[in-house]
């Protein structure tokens, strides 16, 4: 028996031209997930669509441009979306539960663990939790951005074995198949490198409008030991075939050395929002990435942003690529004073005795892979 998180996007659950829900697809999804639940699997559905459904009900021809407009549409649409899911699953005798999360819920350690306990209890009670971002109250600077990231964080939170991302394409392609007859579907990706992510963001990969976020989600999931598959959403029955071992869509291999990160490390690496960045020299990059060492002030070349002690920062290599994240022992102002200097100089530079010798201790540091 496995724990499975399935994410369905707006493009799969509604008609883009009218905003109407694709009830045949959603009915098939409800039937598939109900069969899996009755077979003993633990299922979570992460569903987008509240804003789109709200716009359709309000008769809006376009998505609102303002944050307030989107939040108002989500307030209208979320209830309608859950009502639809309750009818579809209810007709099959399968209870569902609504769980709305914000980024703050996963940034705060106590709320993070409480969300985990709530989802576990909903499983124990035999429900299929249906998760969405709480769009009505989420602030623009602290949004997940899309439900791909949310689904990956939830998969890690509950220690799922599988994350299935349902979308409007068959998977990840080597190029745009509409323009390149040589484009091929990639059945497996063994490494989600920063270069691959940059390629997706640069629109050289088919479906890159939403593919970059799916690659990010697969990387987050991999850090938690979760296998990810991207596949076309109009045939939800494929989920059962994927669990049976069939090669459908694009599967992302679990290539992280050392396996699953601890729950705390996953919270540090992916639950928090970075407040700034540290640019490192080559020696520091090697020590942190290859040697698993703490980051010393001597290896910091530059400080980006303003932040306080204990904030999460991104660690940047010489090519400008993020390769790790960690909680800092010093504020940005203090790091500007001690960067590039030896640890024994810290007290004199800051005028305070007994300061930690590390800028980021390895216990509070996560390398990204």
UniProtKB/Swiss-Prot annotation:
GO cellular component: cytosol
Recorded metabolic or biological pathway in which this protein acts: Amino-acid biosynthesis; L-proline biosynthesis; L-glutamate 5-semialdehyde from L-glutamate: step 1/2
Entry-linked Gene3D superfamilies: Acetylglutamate kinase-like (3.40.1160.10), PUA domain (2.30.130.10)
Annotated catalysed reactions: L-glutamate + ATP = L-glutamyl 5-phosphate + ADP
Family per record: Belongs to the glutamate 5-kinase family.
NCBIfam families membership: proB
Function: Catalyzes the transfer of a phosphate group to glutamate to form L-glutamate 5-phosphate.
Protein name: Glutamate 5-kinase
Lineage: Bacteria, Bacillati, Cyanobacteriota, Cyanophyceae, Gloeobacterales
């Amino acid at each position: 028996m496995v724990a499975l998180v399935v994410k369905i996007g707006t493009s799969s659950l509604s008609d883009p031209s009218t905003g109407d829900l694709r009830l045949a697809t959603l009915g098939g999804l409800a039937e598939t997930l109900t069969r899996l639940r009755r077979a003993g699997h633990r299922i979570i559905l992460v569903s987008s669509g509240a804003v789109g459904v709200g716009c359709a009900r309000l008769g809006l021809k376009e998505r609102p441009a303002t944050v307030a407009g989107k939040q108002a549409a989500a307030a209208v649409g979320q209830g309608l979306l859950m009502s639809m899911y309750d009818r579809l699953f209810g007709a099959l005798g399968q209870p569902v539960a609504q769980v709305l999360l914000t980024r703050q819920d996963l940034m705060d350690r106590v709320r993070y663990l409480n969300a985990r306990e709530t989802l576990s209890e909903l499983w124990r009670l035999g429900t299929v939790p249906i998760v969405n971002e709480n769009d009505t109250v989420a602030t623009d600077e602290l949004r997940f951005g899309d439900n791909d990231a949310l689904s990956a964080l939830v998969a890690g939170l509950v220690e799922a074995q599988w994350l299935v991302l349902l979308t409007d394409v068959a998977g990840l392609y080597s190029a745009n198949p509409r323009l390149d007859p040589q484009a091929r579907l990639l059945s497996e990706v063994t490494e989600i490198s920063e270069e691959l992510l940059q390629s997706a963001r640069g629109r050289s990969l088919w479906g890159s409008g939403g593919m970059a976020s799916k690659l990010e989600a697969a990387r987050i999931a991999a850090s938690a030991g979760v296998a990810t598959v991207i596949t076309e959403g109009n045939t939800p029955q494929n989920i059962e075939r994927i669990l049976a071992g069939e090669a459908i869509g694009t599967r992302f291999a679990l290539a992280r050395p050392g396996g699953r990160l601890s729950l705390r490390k996953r919270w540090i690496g992916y639950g928090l929002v970075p407040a700034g960045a540290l640019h490192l020299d080559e020696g520091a990059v090697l020590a942190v990435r290859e040697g698993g060492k703490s980051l010393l002030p001597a290896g910091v070349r530059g400080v980006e942003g303003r932040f306080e002690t204990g904030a999460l920062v991104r660690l940047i290599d010489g090519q400008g690529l993020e390769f790790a994240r960690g909680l800092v022992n010093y504020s940005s102002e203090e790091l500007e004073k001690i960067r590039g200097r030896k640890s024994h100089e810290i007290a004199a530079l800051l005028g305070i005795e007994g300061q930690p010798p590390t800028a980021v201790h390895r216990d509070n540091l996560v390398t990204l892979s």
